[in-house]
Amino acid sequence: MTPLSKIEALLFVAGEDGLSLRQLATLLDIPVTALLQQLEKMAQKYERDDNSALSLLESSKTYKLVTKKDYADLLRQYSKTPINQSLSRASLEVLSIIAYKQPITRIEVDNIRGVNSSSAISKLQAFDLIQEAGKKEVLGRPNLYVTSDYFLDYMGINSLEELPDASSIELKDEEFTLFDNKENEEQISENVKEENEN
């Protein structure tokens, strides 16, 4: 493993939240100055590599892997294609957790599910079912996620108060989602289909 490959692996797993310089330096056990040199090498590597769709983004001293702007239209098209209309079990599970626990960070969702949720969160954002709602005032200031107004339309409700009662539901049971009711799951897929046709 090289320093660059280690950084890449960490940033990939961190997903949308990214990692701060301090977090990366601690995880890699290297000085910040040396880390900055490696990050610069990584940025240049991605910029020069036409066979890579990735780019290194730095914002407020937090680093994350993102796709290059050149791929925006392609990814937008992907998010609207029929092949991507059905939400996976993982995405439905994450959406359920966010609906009942919002505002919530990606790490908190991960802790409930026991697995990384970056991909599911990105997909839910692409469908406009969830959105960022500021940052949690803790170390690293991770993004907070909430359901969107569009989510209410998908569920056929006017407010979150109309969601099924979760008082007796243990969300850590990974088999439970809002969409265990097959009718609801079919409805959300149908709504996605109708939206893409409009």
Swiss-Prot record:
It holds the Pfam family SMC_ScpB. It is found in: Cytoplasm. Keywords: Cell cycle, Cell division, Chromosome partition, Cytoplasm. GO terms for cellular component: cytoplasm. It comes from the Bacteria. SUPFAM superfamilies: Winged helix' DNA-binding domain. Gene3D superfamilies: Winged helix-like DNA-binding domain superfamily/Winged helix DNA-binding domain (1.10.10.10). Participates in chromosomal partition during cell division. May act via the formation of a condensin-like complex containing Smc and ScpA that pull DNA away from mid-cell into both cell halves. Belongs to the ScpB family. This is Segregation and condensation protein B. It comes from Streptococcus mutans serotype c (strain ATCC 700610 / UA159).
